[in-house]
């Protein structure tokens, strides 16, 4: 069974930050294949520090990295970019959502 906490339910839950794409990369792709960060970095032709920082949740998945991951794993770049966008949005909602709702008024029709 997957250890990843990414589910449709989690994405829809406004009080919870969705999983960072690095956790998904580690739990659903690297570990099952027994692949190291260094091996993936070599295969993608990127610095190991980039992949390591993504796996640790310290760096976002960029469009360039999404293209490389998609090519290597047979996924789509949108898969990786959507994971990043959902993570960023839920994190921003948790950190700033109330202040934004309080400070920004909807445009009058």
Language model: regions and residue ranges:
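Recognition helix of helix-turn-helix/homeodomain-like DNA-binding domains
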Residues: 45-61, 68-70
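Short alpha-helical "recognition helix" segments of helix-turn-helix
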Residues: 36-42, 69
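DNA major-groove recognition helix of helix-turn-helix/homeodomain DNA-binding modules
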Residues: 64-82
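A short, Lys/Arg-rich alpha-helix, primarily the initiator
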Residues: 10-35, 82
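Key DNA-contact positions within bacterial/archaeal DNA-binding proteins
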Residues: 38, 49, 78
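Polybasic, lysine-enriched low-complexity intrinsically disordered terminal tails
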Residues: 1-12, 95-109
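Short amphipathic recognition helices of helix-turn-helix/homeodomain-type DNA-binding modules
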Residues: 79-97
């Amino acid at each position: 069974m997957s250890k990843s906490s990414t589910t449709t339910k989690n994405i829809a839950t406004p009080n919870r930050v969705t999983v960072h794409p690095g956790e998904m990369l580690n739990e659903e792709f690297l570990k099952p294949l027994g692949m190291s960060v260094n091996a993936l970095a070599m295969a993608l032709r990127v610095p190991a520090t980039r992949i390591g920082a993504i796996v640790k949740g310290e760096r976002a998945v960029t469009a360039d990295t999404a293209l490389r991951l998609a090519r290597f794993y047979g996924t789509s770049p949108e898969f990786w970019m959507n994971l990043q966008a959902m993570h960023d949005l839920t994190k921003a909602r948790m950190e700033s959502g109330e202040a934004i709702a309080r400070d920004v008024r909807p445009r009058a029709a």
